[in-house]
Amino acid sequence: MNLNSIPAFDDNYIWVLNDEAGRCLIVDPGDAEPVLNAIAANNWQPEAIFLTHHHHDHVGGVKELVEKFPQIVVYGPQETQDKGTTQVVKDGETAFVLGHEFSVIATPGHTLGHICYFSKPYLFCGDTLFSGGCGRLFEGTASQMYQSLNKLSALPDDTLVCCAHEYTLSNMKFALSILPHDLSINDYYRKVKELRAKNQITLPVILKNERQINVFLRTEDIDLINVINEETLLQQPEERFAWLRSKKDRF
């Protein structure tokens, strides 16, 4: 299968997987126009849409795409049922698309019903995990998001993390503010800065590398613990995650 990213709005990415026959899967189409343009340019035949959550910049293009291609099956969590979803899926279930099984993983935090889709090596994680960061807590709690990130971090090392936004540079600036002397973070920041200076995409990322540079996945890391302990003593990794998320919200 081939993985494609379609830019939308200011910083969204709509992901498309296509097979050799031209059948394709579309993930979180917030805007129909760039997707329709890509379909026409590549002669794709849309088979399915995956929705991760109900926010408009992820679902806004569904109606127009389904009108154009009525055969499309739209998978999504319960919270997207009024956004065009025709097949509601939940944690532990699978979606069989393009000849592959995609596992559905519940990842509450950004929204209460947020889900991710995984079929090795592809992880479509919406607004749960970003490179160098994680989603804001609009509906869920820090505890929920911490548990959700733990689920994703436990996936295989070679997982390709397909996030829905180009937030990597700002996330790495935050990471440097927390761990300014970390070699992995500094190296990755320089790489990302160069890519963005050329207006190039920083995604997808390999999960093994992401675990090294994403402070939200390093809550049991001794260097991070020492930094947090300079300000406040927090015994549990979940508490350290909440501290980080609060810091990022104000960054």
Swiss-Prot record:
Residues engaged in binding Zn(2+) 2: 57-58, 127, 165
Keyword Metal-binding assigned: yes
Associated pathway: Secondary metabolite metabolism; methylglyoxal degradation; (R)-lactate from methylglyoxal: step 2/2
UniProt KW keywords: Hydrolase, Metal-binding, Zinc
SUPFAM superfamilies for the chain: Metallo-hydrolase/oxidoreductase
Biological processes annotated in GO: methylglyoxal catabolic process to D-lactate via S-lactoyl-glutathione
Cofactor: how bound: Binds 2 Zn(2+) ions per subunit.
Record EC number: 3.1.2.6
One GO molecular-function entry: metal ion binding
InterPro entries: Clx_II_MBL, Glyoxalase_II_hydrolase, HAGH_C, Hydroxyacylglutathione_Hdrlase, Metallo-B-lactamas, RibonucZ/Hydroxyglut_hydro
UniProt xrefs under Pfam families: HAGH_C (PF16123), Lactamase_B (PF00753)
Gene3D superfamilies with a match to the protein in the record: Ribonuclease Z/Hydroxyacylglutathione hydrolase-like
Binding residue positions for Zn(2+) 1: 53, 55, 110, 127
Function noted in UniProt: Thiolesterase that catalyzes the hydrolysis of S-D-lactoyl-glutathione to form glutathione and D-lactic acid.
Family statement: Belongs to the metallo-beta-lactamase superfamily. Glyoxalase II family.
Subunit structure: Monomer.
Database matches in PANTHER family: HYDROXYACYLGLUTATHIONE HYDROLASE, HYDROXYACYLGLUTATHIONE HYDROLASE GLOB
Listed name of the protein: Hydroxyacylglutathione hydrolase
Record organism: Escherichia coli O139:H28 (strain E24377A / ETEC)
